[in-house]
Amino acid sequence: MKKIDVKILDSRIGNEFPLPTYATEGSAGLDLRALIDESFEIQPGETKLIPTGLSIYIADPNLAAVILPRSGLGHKHGIVLGNLVGLIDSDYQGPLMVSMWNRGNEPFKIEVGDRIAQLVFVPVVQAEFNIVEDFQQTERGEGGFGHSGKQ
C-alpha cells in the first residue's frame, strides 16, 4: 500500500470523526466528510464549497487523486459534484474541498460529519505529443458518438 502525506486541518478528525479509511478490502475510495461548523441546506440549483478538514501531498508525479460523488447522494437526492470530478495533482498541498451541487427539486441538508464524496488515487501517465501528418488507419477510424451501436 502506498503512503500519502496527510495534514489534519480540523481537530475533530481523529476525535469525533475517523481519518478516512477503506470500508472494505475491495473499496477503491476513501469517504470524505463535511467538516463544517453547523448543518445547512443546499437549495435546488445551488452549489456550495465544503471543507473536508484535510489536505494531502501525493508527491509522486505518477499518481493523482480524484474526488468523486457518492452514488447514493446523486441517485436518491440529486446531489452531485459541482465540477463533476475534482482532480488533485501530485504537487497540490492545499485543503481538500468538495463542490456540491443540488440538481434536485428539494433542499438537501448537510450535517456536520456527513460523508459527502470519495477520494480515489489513480495512476498518471504524462504524455508528450508527436506531430504526424496522418495516423495509421484503424477499423474504427473517425467513428464516434454512437458509432459502435446500441446493443
UniProtKB/Swiss-Prot annotation:
Keywords per UniProt: Hydrolase, Magnesium, Metal-binding, Nucleotide metabolism
Amino-acid positions noted as binding substrate in the UniProt annotation, renumbered to this chain: R70, S71, G72, N83, L87, I88, D89, M97
Source domain of life: Bacteria
Pathway where this protein functions: Pyrimidine metabolism; dUMP biosynthesis; dUMP from dCTP (dUTP route): step 2/2
Cofactor(s) in the UniProt record: Mg(2+)
GO biological process entries: dUMP biosynthetic process; dUTP catabolic process
InterPro entries: dUTPase (IPR008181), dUTPase-like (IPR029054), dUTPase-like_sf (IPR036157), dUTPase_trimeric (IPR033704)
Catalytic reaction equation(s): dUTP + H2O = dUMP + diphosphate + H(+)
Enzyme nomenclature, EC number: 3.6.1.23
Gene Ontology molecular-function annotations: dUTP diphosphatase activity; magnesium ion binding
Keyword Hydrolase: yes
CDD domains: trimeric_dUTPase (cd07557)
The family this protein is said to belong to: Belongs to the dUTPase family.
Its biological purpose: This enzyme is involved in nucleotide metabolism: it produces dUMP, the immediate precursor of thymidine nucleotides and it decreases the intracellular concentration of dUTP so that uracil cannot be incorporated into DNA.
Name of the protein: Deoxyuridine 5'-triphosphate nucleotidohydrolase
Source organism of the structure: Haemophilus influenzae (strain ATCC 51907 / DSM 11121 / KW20 / Rd)
Species lineage: Bacteria, Pseudomonadati, Pseudomonadota, Gammaproteobacteria, Pasteurellales
